[in-house]
Amino acid sequence: MKIVKTLSKKYKYVLKRYQSFKTNPLTKSNPFWALIKYLYINFLLYVLKREVTITYLNGIKAKVKKGDGIVGNYHSGLHEAADSLFLMHLLREGDSFLDIGANVGHYTLLAGLYSKCKVTAIEPIPSTFERLSNNVKSNNWKYQPELLNIGLSNESGELVFTNQQFTTNKVSTSGHGIKVKVKTLDEICSQQIPDFIKIDVEGYEWFVLNGGLNTLSNPNLKLILIELNESGKNFNIQDEQIIELLKDKGFLPYVFDLETKTFAAIDFKNTNQFNTLFIKDLDFVSSRIGTTLELQF
């Protein structure tokens, strides 16, 4: 009976995944092929327990393990397709892109290799940082990214991070884990204000932003892509607080429609996905949209 329940659960999960391929703009023309690729890569990762090097999007290379979100670049065309495609429309060669919580490098590789941005990538967990570094070394760059093995907070010092949670390691609330050096966003941006920032720090967004109030006030920073999924509650922070802070600094939340290439203002956050676009300079961002992407998967 237990086996039947397990198989039923897995079948429902695979079916749900297939339905997502039918709506993904990059796989909806052939969702069955995407499903085959999904099953194949997961067989290699979970059953054979291999590390696999994938090649995607005009030749980008990345080594992946089970649990990595970046695996989506193999079976789904792109990991976090909506946000990735938006950034591919937005970013231009020479733009400054700050990837906070880079993990093994999805957005670092996308911004630096496809769009040829000048990237600074921040990843606090040493083992994850090593994988990020290896993925960077596996590719040829026009502008070599700056990689920082530190965390960010509202003040400089040290914090304890978990290190046994695969791709979701974060600041430890129990005090157990590894000590990591942390700086503030304002320190990191003291020499150059980035054009665009991506933040994914597993609930610690409030503290990262409060360490960068001067940076947030600078008009050169035009857009922040930030993950808001209620995980700030682990640190007694509500998403509403983060949104109000960003609004106070001139960043308003929007949803981008890939088909019409238009922006719709929203009051809160994008509830259809984890990441939300907060835009300070809508005219500038809108002026970048509309070009046809050259994609080879």
Which positions does each model-derived feature cover?
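S-adenosyl-L-methionine
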Residues: 1-125, 130-135, 139-144, 174, ...
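Short internal loop-to-helix segment that lines adenine-nucleotide cofactor pockets
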Residues: 75-96, 144-146, 157-160, 165-219, ...
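Short, conserved loop/helix-junction motifs that constitute active-site signature segments
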Residues: 111-114, 212-220, 246
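Hydrophobic pocket-lining residues within nucleotide cofactor-binding pockets
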Residues: 150-152, 201, 228
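Short alpha-helix
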Residues: 182, 237-248
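Conserved beta-strand signature within the Rossmann-like core of class I S-adenosyl-L-methionine
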Residues: 220-228
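A SAM-dependent methyltransferase catalytic signature shared across enzymes that methylate proteins
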Residues: 243-261
